[in-house]
Amino acid sequence: MSKFFRRRKFCKFTAEGVKEIDYKDLNTLRQYLTENGKIVPSRVTGTKSKYQRQLATAVKRARFLALIPYTDNHDV
């Protein structure tokens, strides 16, 4: 038997009953971005594939409208 118990991942959007992810909800979108601005994969976050696709679309829309940056590291 293993010593450590890995906590089961669950989809926060399913638990909260979200129907569609809004691109204007920046606090939610930032939870699913890395510090470099990349979208975190669903195998890490535990989101269902339906919501992961909506999340990716919402992040891309927010980036296009300059609500969130494409990258956070700008070393000049």
Curated annotation (Swiss-Prot):
Keywords: Ribonucleoprotein, Ribosomal protein, RNA-binding, rRNA-binding. PROSITE patterns: RIBOSOMAL_S18. This is Small ribosomal subunit protein bS18. InterPro entries: Ribosomal_bS18 (IPR001648), Ribosomal_bS18_CS (IPR018275), Ribosomal_bS18_sf (IPR036870). PANTHER family: 30S RIBOSOMAL PROTEIN S18 (PTHR13479), SMALL RIBOSOMAL SUBUNIT PROTEIN BS18M (PTHR13479:SF40). It holds the Pfam family Ribosomal_S18. GO terms for cellular component: cytosolic small ribosomal subunit. Belongs to the bacterial ribosomal protein bS18 family. It comes from the Bacteria. The lineage of its organism: Bacteria, Pseudomonadati, Pseudomonadota, Gammaproteobacteria, Lysobacterales. Part of the 30S ribosomal subunit. Forms a tight heterodimer with protein bS6. One of its GO terms (molecular function) is structural constituent of ribosome. Transmembrane segments: none annotated. GO terms for biological process: translation. Binds as a heterodimer with protein bS6 to the central domain of the 16S rRNA, where it helps stabilize the platform of the 30S subunit.
